[in-house]
Amino acid sequence: VASAHLALTNSELDMASIDHERLGVDFGANQMFSTPDVLSDGVFQCDEGGKFDFDRWGEEGLAGMEPLWLLKYLPNMPACHIGIHADARGPNNSLTLAEASGISAMGEALAIISTGRADMMLAGSTGSRIQPTKCLHAALWDEMAQYDDAAPGTWSRPFDASRRGQIAGEGACTFVFEEEEHAKARGAAIFGSILSSASCCVIDVDGTPRTQDALVGAISKALERAGVSPSDIGHINAHGLGSKQADIDEANAIHQVFGASASTVPVTAFKSVIGNSGAACGTLELAASLIGLQHGVVPATLNYSTPDNDCRLNIIHGEPLKTDNKLFLTVNVTAFGQAAALVACGV
């Protein structure tokens, strides 16, 4: 809600004069996790000699849960409360696709505007991977970075040969989307334009995610819809998770789509700065590129010093890259084989 409020303030939108029936919300969000103490009473009711008895949950476990537990943690709450805050009575939707949520929500918001269902959309995403329960899940299931001989601020090392995994982050980012003519007519400050977005999910029949193929599908379709070729792209804001295999899969996907230019197109990985904020990362990374391009630069990747021969990418590091090319690609992918890509142009 705070990010949406700041976006509306920055947009200088006259809220008293707009048609609120034509203002909508499309927001990506992680699954919301309650803290362990919220669930503990119900879980203890089902304890049988130190083991959880699922058969007792319906009658005994639920009785230990607060009645409004589910409503407090539904991932549509961000879009709901943003809609209330802005009195946005147009289309309202929530997407929960882990790290692919932000780009997917923005793509859907653009489709709503282009089909005439709204004049403006508040599009964005929010996520936290530092919430206690989510941290526990990440520690159990994800490849988390840890170094005994380095400061924590250096642990996130996307595409670096010494990388050991991701670090947890949190955040939220909201954009006000509208047609260019609509924005110019009201004298809005324009940060950039979205040319296209695309998503792709590839999973084997046995449930194994094929993240490289998903990325290839999303990137290829986004470029095709934008009517641009790989050689037109000024930089890529990569997913850059920082885990060993995930970065290799992403690099391979870039090489597969970009061909000979894959080793030269500048690549930045903003998770080196903010960590993995889950659903929020797509919008935060788009904002980083757009704000950088306003100053004629692309943000650098932190903690990158040793190239990985398995990636072979032109990673921007050391200092921001000066550029006149405003066209760029940003991509995200989940551990479950869901990928999203977006082509944008800065100002």
Feature map (PLM): residue ranges:
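Active-site nucleophile and cofactor-binding loops and adjacent substrate-binding regions
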Residues: 1, 18-20, 69-75, 94-102, ...
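A glycine- and small-aliphatic-rich helix-loop capping segment at beta-alpha/alpha-beta transitions
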Residues: 34-51, 113-115, 135-148, 214, ...
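Flexible, low-complexity linker/loop segments at domain and module junctions
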Residues: 19-20, 226, 230-232, 263, ...
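Acyl-CoA/ACP chain-elongation machinery
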Residues: 117-164, 197-210, 240-248, 264-314
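Active-site-proximal alpha-helical scaffold in enzymes
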Residues: 1-13, 75-79, 83-86, 92-127, ...
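Condensing-enzyme catalytic core mediating Claisen C-C bond formation in acyl metabolism
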Residues: 149-228, 234-235, 347
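Glycine-/small-residue-rich "gating" segment that lines the acyl/pantetheine channel
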Residues: 47-65, 107, 111, 115, ...
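Conserved beta-ketoacyl condensing-enzyme motif
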Residues: 1-86, 90-92, 127-135, 230-246
